[in-house]
Amino acid sequence: LGIAFAGTWFAHKYPERRAQMRLLFDAALSAQTPDNRFDIYSRFLGREERYQFPEPYASHVVGSLDYDRMLSAYRSYKVFLNVNTVTTSPSMMARRVLELVACGTPVVSTPAPSLSRFLGDGIIQVSEPAQAEEAVRALVADPDLRARLVHRGQRELWRAHTYAHRVDTVLSSLGIDHEPTRLPSASVIVSTVRPHRLDHLLDRVAAQRDVDLELLVATHGFEAPDLVARARERGLDRITVVPMPTEAALGDCLNALVERALGEVCSKMDDDDWYGPDYLADLLRAMRYAEADVVGKHCRFVHLAARDLTVLVQEPNEHRYTDFVAGPTLTARREVLRAIPFLSVSRGEDTTFLSRAVDARLRVYAADRFNFVQERSGRPEDHTWTEDDEVFLRGGTPCPPLAWDPERP
């Protein structure tokens, strides 16, 4: 389905609201296509005439839904429209907007300061007819734009606008001591055989924000006596370096890091991949809302360096429970990794862990595709997984250069 609005027409009051509706509705009528029609759900359908939508909008009224069915309808549309009865308040806004974003549906709205405060750039605000039509057309046509917009909005929701956050506010206002809602602490664990990749790794970890983290690095077959100092230059004060002998298996290196980890969650990173600044916080939020034991990314961007090409792989496999996440994104509760340690192998240690976790009936969740790019150098010796580029090309969608930037969104 295409474009939708849900609400009420007031013929007898709120003239500014009616003007906003005409602005957005006319844009929707211009932007709709046979496959992406404009639908209106009228809250007061069949009641007094003053609540009925006039033409040319009345012919687009498709019914009225109760609350539960309306929540299901939210997920069915590419774009939802929103207007604001109160346009100057920094706090008043329709709960519907937050519900839509939580359901994964982009919202185009007329402006209100509350929208920017609650959702940042995770919602599109328009005030002119051409601007409104352009926004609706773009969202209907571009699934990547829809996904990025929703992801930015959802990040704000999970960061500060769940019911748990509101309970925190109430308890704090009443002066009641309580444990506030927070993300779990994290231990980033990295085993590397490449001294020349350490600066890249430190830069990626140091860029993480909104996370209480420590870094644990296994230097596999080499010493890095200045690594702690280099980390602290970047603001990484909590770092543990564990030298491991060359003959140690990768699984043993990772287990050694998990045993030393202090974080509630351990997140495995690779030294050559690209992790955006919101990467880890997004995964920890996904772990919380999905009530998962293990999270990571299945759908993801992969940069094929030998071809200078980036592809999006496993596109349907995000925002769902699964039995697989990519090894460089594997993030699990510390007690899970201690109960199900990595096998003493140097290949497949992550996939065997996932298989055993699923067998133990633990919940594995594949989060969104964003803030991560898997780097494939084109040299098999650089990777523990030796599949060639053709594997990714066969199952991937080529992306324009900016689409895979880990800094976006």
Language-model regions, residue ranges each:
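Nucleotide-sugar donor-binding catalytic core of glycosyltransferases
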Residues: 1-98, 103-115, 120
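C-terminal catalytic/acceptor-binding lobe
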Residues: 151, 340-409
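Short, acidic, metal-binding catalytic loop of nucleotide-sugar glycosyltransferases
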Residues: 203-212
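Active-site nucleotide-sugar/metal-binding loop of Leloir-type enzymes
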Residues: 254-265
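Short beta-strand-to-loop acidic/aromatic patch adjacent to the donor-nucleotide binding site
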Residues: 263-274
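A recurrent flexible, glycine/aromatic-enriched loop bordering the glycosyltransferase active site
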Residues: 302, 313-332
